[in-house]
Amino acid sequence: MELKRVVVTGLGAITPLGNTLPETWEGIINGKSGAGPITQFDASKFKTQFACEVKGFDPLTVMDRKEARKCDRYSLFAINAAKQAIDDAAMDLDKEDKNRIGVIFASGIGGIKTFDEEVLGYAKIKDTIGPKFNPFFIPKMISDIADRKSVV
């Protein structure tokens, strides 16, 4: 079996330290903590009141509002970081064979925010005709959906 060469040409990052790779790196070398008070949900009933949340993130930098509504927040992070990596690589996508371009990213659980919203929303509604889940519930939630959204 012949091994193919892989070349990393660009990097991107969305982290609690910053929404770009330079911001994140700056935070790392300066010993900055990404931890702070939980703001994404009401954590008043939990012992822990702090987390490492991504702050100041604007998904509309890489996609329109209509597309962004179909994605869980983690997918928006992945898509944005992939776009940063493409920009960092200074690739002219009109001149590249897109079948030879790939992005590697990792997520432990996927769309937990979507899962939370749907399940908690369902628990609050007493409806005799059954559950009324968002039709994008599963596509937004599954962890491999972010790599299906193209930025190229």
What are these regions (language model features)?
Residues 1-152:
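Conserved "HGTGT" condensation-loop signature of ketosynthase/thiolase-family condensing enzymes
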